[in-house]
Amino acid sequence: MTELLSPAGGREALVAAVQNGADAVYMGFGSFNARRSARNFSDEEFLAAVRYCHLRGVKVYLTLNTLVTDRELPALAETARRASEYGVDAILVQDWGVYETLRAVIPDVPLHASTQMALHTLSGVEEAARLGMTRAVLARELSGEEIREIAERAPIEIETFAHGALCMCYSGMCEMSAVIGGRSGNRGACAQPCRLRYGWHGKADANPLSLKDANLAAYAGEMAEMGVACLKLEGRMKRSEYVAAVTGIYAALLREHRAPTADEQKKLALAFSRDGFTDGYYRGRRGKEMFGVRPETARWPEEWFGTLRAAYEKEDMRLVPVRFRAALRLGEPMVLTAEDGDGHCVTVTGVAPEAARSRAVTAGEVEARLRKTGGTAFTVSDCAVTAEDGLSVPASALNALRRDALAALEALRTEIPERREGTFVPAERIKNPTEPPRFTVSIYRAGQLTDALVNEGVETVYVPLELLPSVEVEKYRERTRFAAVLPRVWRTADEEGLREQLRTAKERGAECAVLGNLGHFALVRGLDMELRGDFGLNVFNSAALRFLQEQGLSGATLSFELRHEQLRDISKCIPCEAIVYGRLPLMITENCIVANEFGCRHFKGRCGAVCADSACAGAPELTDRVGERFPVLHAYGCRSELQNGKTLWLADKPEYRKSGLTYARLRFTTESAEECVRVLRAYKGREEYTPKDITRGLFYRGVE
């Protein structure tokens, strides 16, 4: 049966989820999880939570799905070790350094690829399986048919979101909160700037980045039928009563193999919605109807929530059925066997019955006494008593027999498996290169690549794979190197075409492929190209670099959320690069932000490269409440990539040159060809030039 996975932001939410039918819960423990402002659990609370869940047949998944620094890795390793000791069933991960650490420290604990890994193709799931992960959580943006294709062919379990908040950006790729306010969504501190007001033509008069919550209750049975192993409910930041309501309804749908009633749909909306729900992504649709905000006048349904709370607080909505077999014989210790439905069986003995001096106890009276399981997590589903005639046994002895049996059964159900433990070993310290970094450039338009730019000295030109046919590679390849940048988001159906484009790119002179997602590894396998990691791999620590080296990468771009000291201190086992100029990418979205507002005849065509007459060809600008303008660029497949309104500028700062970087990237997006040349000359100290509206990004302030 498909597992129902519910959020547990605290102890009350945990009880609400379990009592209302969750098969598993996911929770945070310590500070290393994607919802750091949730209540989460202390050591004692986490151990108690695991016991509470396991006693009732519920699994516990720990969320360690954030990016961590080298300094934080030892504490994370200790957190994971304790979680393993407490019996956690699996751990969700995003950071490749965390993955490497957990494989070494707790090799027997199953790992799940978090949605923060942005897995959205079969190839990505297959790569996760190759690395030993047992489950992959798919991106929320996939359609039902795309989920089916992956679930039916995947070598590991597939988990998908069924209900709750939708991020505007693909999870794990959003930098908006980090860049604007220093609160990183990749480190569990997202400030949700997507819920604020934005607009066009200089006005912030709408909410074009605020998606409605997903509601796939009508498709729960369909997803179970297609082989989805787990349906996930979002909501670790929501109220416990919300968790109770949504869990209860979805549990009933899965258990009873039916569609939701009109009343159940009404209750889901009453529990929480943003002006209704959406199932657009699941149905393979995009558009303005998917967007909404929670009205300021919205109120929690306190009366109904009070009823829900009163029910789950009794903690008797979910009891473990047990079968009793009791035998009472004169002069022999009483024997009671207890068995649950999960294969656990215990036998305990009690005092020996004596011959009755007056009225003898009956089998019915013994059964009635054994069935009194109030205050425990058990209920007696069947009780068979074999008792000789004429026996006397104290009620206290029967109570003790029952308690002993249930205690023994509880011990079996909450038994912690024996697991191996390894030692955390920090990455080997490698001395930074002392030479200043060489400059690479990435372009967005073919016209940005000119003789003037190349003649200034460019180590490598990064070109989007779909743009390469428009670039004169042959003209410049004797003077610079070319790297084909794979799309950040694509689909399984695109992969044959992408491989063919890569082969063509290599034949034309592109020596390198740039990877930004786990699924890219499968696309480039066997092509014999140099491989570099892009910023999408979220390299935040030395262990992640070591992992990428083991996967065959010859270089990697470090996360632009790192401060310059953190960039410097990473142990660079392979050549490293950092973005030191340009508009930083804030979001990549499945919905085309521009087409939603202005319409576009290419919207349904899923174009690879931007078309000259498309709505996004001119990089229209989204405006926020303070007048900041954010250019919106076309991304592969008619998606949108939102850029920062200010341009990262470090030409006048010496620190990046002393950070041990082999390459420093200039990221060109909206610049003219002339501006590209001036920027490169300025970074090389050949021209006095500073663009307007600059920022130092996160180079000095870092992120929470």
Report each predicted region and the residues it spans.
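Conserved nucleotide-cofactor-binding alpha/beta core module
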Residues: 122-123
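Glycine-rich, highly charged phosphate/nucleotide-binding loops
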Residues: 41-46
